[in-house]
Amino acid sequence: GASCRCDSDGPTSRGNTLTGTLWLIGRCPSGWHNCRGSGPFIGYCCKQ
């Protein structure tokens, strides 16, 4: 899937490593968690 920015990645996506995986269908899979607290985005930003 596409990469997305977790809260722990820093305030901007420029020059930072995107450690999350964008999950569009439903919630994050089992064993993963949503690593994005807030913001206008589609789906969930999931991380193992």
Swiss-Prot record:
Superkingdom assignment: Eukaryota
Site (Important for toxicity): N16
Function in brief: Binds voltage-dependently at site 3 of sodium channels (Nav) and inhibits the inactivation of the activated channels, thereby blocking neuronal transmission. Possesses the highest efficacy for the insect sodium channel para/tipE (EC(50)=5.5 nM), and has effect on Nav1.2/SCN2A (in complex with SCN1B), Nav1.4/SCN4A (in complex with SCN1B) and Nav1.5/SCN5A (in complex with SCN1B). Also interacts with sodium channels in cardiac cells. Shows lethality to crabs.
Any single GO BP term: regulation of signal transduction
UniProt miscellaneous comment: Negative results: has no effect on voltage-gated sodium channel Nav1.8/SCN10A (in complex with SCN1B).
Any one GO MF annotation of this record: sodium channel regulator activity
SUPFAM superfamilies per the UniProt record, alphabetical: Defensin-like
Disulfide bonds: C4-C45, C6-C35, C28-C46
Localization per Swiss-Prot or TrEMBL: Secreted; Nematocyst
Protein name stated in the entry: Delta-actitoxin-Bgr2a
Keywords, sorted A to Z: Cardiotoxin, Disulfide bond, Ion channel impairing toxin, Nematocyst, Neurotoxin, Secreted, Toxin, Voltage-gated sodium channel impairing toxin
InterPro entries, sorted: Anenome_toxin (IPR000693), Myo_ane_neurotoxin_sf (IPR023355)
Family in the record: Belongs to the sea anemone sodium channel inhibitory toxin family. Type I subfamily.
An annotated GO cellular component: nematocyst
